[in-house]
């Protein structure tokens, strides 16, 4: 930041500070459930700080969900570069979330993986976790980790009311479970058919 200021370009330079996942074996997920390697919010939800005085109001807060894969199309747009057309781009341009009170399209889905395995999907306030047993090492390295009861699967959470993912609502909302499972299956099928991301 000092170098940007000394060269007189700090006001019109976008600086982003974020992380790729929640804490691993140490640190705190800030009251959220889960850690790195799990599809709970504590494993994925991280802060992002964007500094761009010319375009972003100081101390403004955006609570809309986004993912690191959204940075690629956003930065290309800012640079005036078209997205490549020879491959599928999973991210969305989130410039309106950074510079104004924009909202993410409520039909947008966020997909959560552990290694190559699709584990969960989020759409709006709903989070659907279908499988969280993919990190079941023979000896868990994280003292906070515990195996989940597969009889409770799948898991459905209302993140607006339950950001700590404490109450599985699958029995109360079978229609939402069915809709989320359909989204899950469709996405998984598209990924297997197009493993390299090429059209």
Where are these regions (language model features)?
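Loop/turn elements at helix/coil->beta-strand transitions in domains of secreted/extracellular proteins
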Residues: 9-15, 45, 105-108, 123-126, ...
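Structural recognition of the beta-strand scaffold that forms the well-ordered cores
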Residues: 14-18, 48-51, 73-77, 109-113, ...
């Amino acid at each position: 930041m000092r170098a940007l200021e000394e060269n007189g370009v700090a006001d019109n330079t976008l600086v982003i500070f974020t992380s790729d996942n929640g804490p691993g074996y140490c640190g705190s997920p800030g009251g959220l459930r889960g850690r790195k390697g799990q599809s709970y919010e504590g494993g994925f939800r991280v802060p992002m700080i964007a500094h761009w005085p010319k375009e972003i109001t100081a101390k403004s807060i955006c609570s809309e969900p986004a993912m690191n894969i959204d940075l690629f199309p956003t930065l290309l747009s800012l640079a005036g570069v078209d997205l490549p057309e020879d491959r599928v781009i999973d991210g969305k341009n989130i410039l309106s979330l950074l510079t104004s009170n924009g909202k993410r399209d409520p039909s947008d889905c966020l997909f959560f993986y552990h290694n190559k395995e699709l584990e969960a999907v989020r759409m709006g306030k709903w989070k659907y976790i279908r499988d969280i047993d993919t990190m079941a090492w023979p000896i868990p390295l994280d003292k906070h980790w515990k195996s989940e009861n597969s009889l409770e699967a799948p898991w459905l959470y209302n993140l607006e009311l339950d950001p700590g993912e404490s109450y599985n609502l699958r029995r109360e909302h079978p229609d939402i479970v069915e809709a989320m499972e359909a989204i899950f299956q469709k996405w998984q099928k598209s990924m297997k058919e197009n493993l390299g991301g090429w059209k």
